[in-house]
C-alpha cells in the first residue's frame, strides 16, 4: 500500500491530501470512513479514549447515519469531528455530477452541516471536486491503512502504516464490517506505535470559513455549476 501519486495530487488544487507540517510539530491526523457501524464505531471511540483521549475525524455515510443516529451523537459528544462521505457511498467516476452533488447534500441534511467531504473510494472527477470545494473542504489522504483489503493481514496493514506515516499525514481507517479483522488488530497497535515515536494524534484542523458568496446551494451558484 503506497501513498497516492503526486500526479493525482496536482489535478485539483483545492483538495487536501496532507496537512503541511512545520518546525518540530509531529501531528498525525486520523480519519475513519464508511461508518457509523453499531459495534465497530463505539469500539473505535473507546480505543481513542484509552490511548490518551485522542480525537479523530469520522467520514460518515448518510444511509448508515440514519440507522444509527445515537452513534453520531456519541461521536460529537466525545469531541470527534463528523464529516460527509456521501449518502450512499457512490463513486464519482460512475455517477453523474448532478446525482453526485445531490448525494452530498442528502448526507449533509442527515448529518447536519459539516465542514468536510471525502469522496468514497477516493473517486471524484475534477469538476465534482471544484464544485464541492465552493461549499466544503474535500479531503483525501496520503496514508491508507489498507484495512479494507481482505488479502492483507492486520500485521501487513500495521507495517504499511509505520513505513508511510510522517508529520502531517492524513491516515485512513474504516469502521466497517469488511475492514473489521484488520482494524481490530492494526488500530490499537498503531496508536501504541505513534505514541512511542512521539507523534501527536489530532482530528483534522479547522478549515478557514468559506465566504457565503461562494457556497453551493444545489447547482444554482455559477461558481459551483458542473458539467
Region spans (language model):
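Conserved strand-to-helix beginnings and helix N-cap segments that scaffold or border functional pockets
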Residues: 41-42, 68-69, 97, 151-154, ...
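C-terminal domain-boundary segment and adjacent tail
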Residues: 10-23, 50-52, 66, 181-227
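Glycine-enriched alpha-helix->loop->beta-strand junction motifs that scaffold or abut catalytic
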Residues: 52-54, 77-82, 133-141, 167
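Active-site beta->alpha N-cap acidic-glycine motif
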Residues: 2-95, 99, 106, 113-114
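A cross-domain feature marking catalytic cores of carbohydrate-active enzymes
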Residues: 32-34, 58-62, 84-86, 119-121, ...
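Generic structural signal for well-ordered alpha-helices
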Residues: 45, 69-73, 101-108, 129, ...
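His/Asp/Glu-enriched short active-site or ligand-binding loop at hydrolase and phosphoryl-transfer sites
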Residues: 123-164, 198-210
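Alpha-helical scaffold elements within enzyme catalytic domains, especially in hydrolases
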Residues: 47-50, 74, 131, 163, ...
Amino acid at each position: 500500500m503506497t501513498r497516492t501519486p503526486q500526479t493525482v495530487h496536482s489535478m485539483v488544487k483545492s483538495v487536501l491530501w496532507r496537512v503541511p507540517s512545520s518546525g518540530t510539530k509531529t501531528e498525525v491526523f486520523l480519519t475513519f470512513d464508511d461508518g457509523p457501524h453499531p459495534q465497530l464505531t463505539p469500539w473505535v471511540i473507546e480505543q481513542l479514549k484509552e490511548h490518551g483521549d485522542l480525537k479523530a475525524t469520522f467520514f460518515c455515510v448518510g444511509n448508515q447515519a440514519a440507522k444509527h443516529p445515537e452513534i453520531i451523537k456519541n461521536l460529537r459528544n466525545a469531541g470527534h469531528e463528523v464529516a460527509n462521505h456521501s449518502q450512499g457511498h457512490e463513486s464519482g467516476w460512475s455517477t453523474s455530477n448532478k446525482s453526485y452533488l445531490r448525494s452530498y447534500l442528502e448526507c449533509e441534511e442527515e448529518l447536519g452541516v459539516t465542514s468536510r467531504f471525502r469522496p468514497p473510494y477516493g473517486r471524484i472527477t475534477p469538476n465534482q471536486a471544484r464544485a464541492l470545494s465552493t461549499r466544503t473542504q474535500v479531503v483525501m489522504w496520503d496514508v491508507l491503512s489498507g484495512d479494507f483489503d481482505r488479502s492483507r493481514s492486520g500485521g501487513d496493514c500495521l507495517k504499511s502504516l509505520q513505513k508511510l506515516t510522517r508529520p502531517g499525514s492524513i491516515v485512513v481507517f474504516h469502521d466497517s464490517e469488511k475492514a473489521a479483522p484488520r482494524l481490530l488488530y492494526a488500530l490499537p497497535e498503531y496508536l501504541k506505535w505513534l505514541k512511542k515515536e512521539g507523534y501527536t494524534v489530532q482530528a483534522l484542523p479547522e478549515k478557514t470559513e468559506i465566504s457565503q458568496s461562494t457556497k453551493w446551494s444545489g447547482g444554482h451558484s455559477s461558481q459551483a455549476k458542473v458539467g
